[in-house]
Amino acid sequence: MRIFYGTESGNSEMVASDIADEYGLEAEDLTELDADVFEAGTLYLIVCATHGEGELPEGVDEFADALRDSSPDLTGVRYAMFGLGDSTYPDYSKGSEVLDALLAELGAERVGEYGRHDAAGGSDCSEVGLSWAEMVVEQHALVPVG
């Protein structure tokens, strides 16, 4: 299992790091990864914020462009998505949806519930993210690493 994040203000990084700590893993910044990072047989937990008007965070858009350009066959790749946003804006959580659609287009399979944190709701994003990750891991019978 690997944990990736795309962040603008640091909240997605914090959530991903808290999840990674729970499983003895490292959270990895999407802006520092190559498009060939995905491997069949590995589950990816992806935490992604929304920036601007429903866009990916700065730098993550470049990762997405690299994925589009290289068009890898992601058949056999499983991922779970957790989006952060603020429902007072019309493009709530759209950044993660952009990445989700791209991964699906390339053949990857989203598993588990699509997790979301609404900044307007007042709940702690890490608590919501940890609950989501626990549910995904439990549903897919993964043994925690560490």
Role assignments for model-derived ranges:
Residues 34-40:
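Short amphipathic alpha-helix with an adjacent loop that forms part of the alpha/beta core around
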Residues 28, 33:
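Long, contiguous binding/interaction regions
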Residues 2, 8-14, 21-22, 26, ...:
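FMN-binding flavodoxin-like domain, especially the glycine-rich phosphate-binding loop
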